[in-house]
Amino acid sequence: GSAWALQHPQWMLDARGKAKQEDWTKDGEHDSYLFNLGNPEACRWMSKYIGDFLEENGIDYYRQDFNIEPEGFWAANDEPGRQGICEIRYIEGLYSFWEYLLNRFPGLLVDNCASGGRRIDLESISRSAPMWRTDYSYGEPIGYQCHTYGLNLYLPLHGTGTVSADKFTFRSSLGTSIIYNWKITEAGQSIYDMRDRQAEFKELRPYFYEDYYPLSGINNITSENIWLAYQLYRPSDDSGYIVAFRRKDNPDKSYTVNLSGLHPDHTYILTNKDTGEAIKKTGKELANGFTLTLDNPQSSLII
């Protein structure tokens, strides 16, 4: 009964009972449609409609989510012997839609969400950025560390949330974007800690746009008994950070890493952001091995 479904029924995909949307039924019948971006006429109309809306309202940040199961809509509309074509045409239309917006608004950010990180493919990320990268257990730090550790290898722009202002949890969510979900009115919460974490994020954020080096290998990175560490390096001014985590079951107070990208003959000052301790090392020394120290499990450091 929506306006678009009544005005343009030919642009709607009907799942004909095959979509996995049990809550979207009425009298036993499926009661929803999927707007068909695979229809060129529909795609052009939607592109202009959203583009006009952005222009009229001065919007420069466009976020698109997709919290339904589209497979049933696509499968129900495939022609015999043409399995997958409806999906292919739809995704081609989606890319065309985003390209229209980016061509019309060159400074636009397209924030791409699909049930959390389900569209982190090369074609999508060439047109958009997943500022909510996953619906994985919200605030669980080990998973978040692993997401950052892997995605940074090829995807500078991605983000997630944080529910706690403690250093270990917050630093697990570092990236180019963080959504703060702090309960500032709850007992025991510290506004000062929150402000410190925000300042730390703003300080490190620009470094995620340049060089990245994982420092602790790729084996068993989900385990609770390891150290996980990575390096952010900015060749533009020869500066950077080390971010490291000692997980709760790790027995070792120290861990040695080999830094990359540094000039062998340059001298670098390394300052522990938590203790203020500073030392000097050459790039060659840092490449040959630098030892990180954390006295307690479930702790972190930034240098």
Task: Label each PLM-derived region with a short phrase.
Residues 1, 7, 14, 64-67, ...:
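Generic beta-strand/beta-sheet core signal
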Residues 1-52, 56:
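Active-site-adjacent "subsite" loops/lids of carbohydrate-active enzymes
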Residues 2-7, 72-77, 119-129:
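Histidine/acidic-residue-rich catalytic or RNA/ligand-binding cores of hydrolases
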Residues 11-19, 76-90:
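Glycine-rich tight-turn/loop motif centered on a GG-T
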Residues 33-37, 41, 81-92:
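Alpha-helix capping and helix-loop boundary segments enriched in small/acidic/polar residues
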Residues 45-79:
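Active-site groove signature of glycoside hydrolases
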Residues 55, 68, 94-278, 298-301:
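Active-site-proximal substrate-binding groove within the catalytic cores of carbohydrate-active enzymes
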Residues 281-303:
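C-terminal beta-strand-rich structural cap/linker in extracellular carbohydrate-active enzymes
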